[in-house]
């Protein structure tokens, strides 16, 4: 087995355990008998395989599904109705939508369209940058984040073997958030810390928005690409 193959297997084993634990926590918080309609902003239909609820997935890219309603759109500005879903959900998407003002718009859309909110994102202060699968990557100077370094010296480069366009796309769109920023984006929600080895790996905003959010104005540019895990 090559080093890349071993790394791939190890990462998918660890990531799979986190997904399983997070899924169990999600079902406990939002049981199907109480939460029947869910909208996923910026998600993938494969995330909802086996789910029996009424699921709507909105993403920039077209997707096909036999079990989800699929919409093509920008999560920062949607035509979805106010409080039109029992739960507005997002998993590892808000860090991809652009600058701070784009993240504000995305967070407000989640709180506008859902009676309840669930928004997960990687923690900026976790030492391992989970998109590049490299320690301290998000703290390196931009000069080092070039194609050659990304392709041959990051875990993501080994696993995905991205082309130059995708490397640049990640560089332009990934903006990680802190606990304090998540509290600011979701003032009515509790922000849970998902830990690994005692360190906060991910942040999850969960709660019921108490204020009414107006639909945001249409953004000048489209939001970033979805995460593929």
Where are these regions (language model features)?
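Conserved N-terminal segment of class I S-adenosyl-L-methionine
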Residues: 1-82, 87, 199-202, 213-229
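A short beta-strand submotif of the Rossmann-like class I SAM-dependent methyltransferase core
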Residues: 87-93
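A short, conserved alpha-helix within the catalytic core of class I
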Residues: 97-114
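Conserved helix-to-beta-strand junction in the class I
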Residues: 109-113, 120, 185
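Conserved class I S-adenosyl-L-methionine
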Residues: 116-149
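Short, glycine-/aromatic-enriched active-site segment of Class I SAM-dependent methyltransferases
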Residues: 132-135, 155-169
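Short alpha-helix
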Residues: 168-190
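Conserved Class I S-adenosyl-L-methionine
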Residues: 189-204
């Amino acid at each position: 087995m090559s080093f890349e193959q071993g790394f791939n297997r190890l990462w998918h084993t660890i990531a799979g355990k986190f997904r399983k634990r997070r899924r169990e926590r999600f079902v406990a918080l939002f049981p199907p008998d109480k939460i029947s309609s869910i909208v996923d902003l910026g998600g993938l239909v494969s995330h909802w395989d086996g789910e029996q609820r009424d699921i709507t997935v909105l993403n920039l890219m077209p997707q096909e599904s036999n079990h989800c309603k699929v919409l093509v759109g920008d999560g920062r500005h949607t035509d979805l109705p106010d409080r039109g879903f029992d739960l507005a959900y997002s998993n590892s998407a808000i860090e991809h939508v652009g600058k701070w003002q784009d993240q504000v718009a995305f967070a407000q859309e989640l709180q506008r369209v859902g009676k309840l909110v669930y928004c997960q994102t990687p923690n900026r202060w976790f030492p391992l940058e989970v998109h590049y699968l490299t320690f301290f990557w998000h703290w390196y100077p931009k000069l080092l984040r070039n194609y050659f370094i990304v392709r041959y010296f990051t875990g993501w480069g080994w696993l995905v073997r991205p082309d130059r366009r995708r490397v640049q796309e990640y560089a332009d769109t990934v903006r990680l958030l802190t606990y304090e920023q998540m509290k600011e984006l979701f003032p009515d929600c509790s922000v849970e810390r998902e830990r690994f080895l005692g360190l906060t790996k991910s942040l999850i905003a969960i709660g019921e928005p108490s204020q009414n959010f107006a639909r945001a104005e249409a953004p000048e540019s489209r939001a970033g690409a979805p995460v593929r895990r």
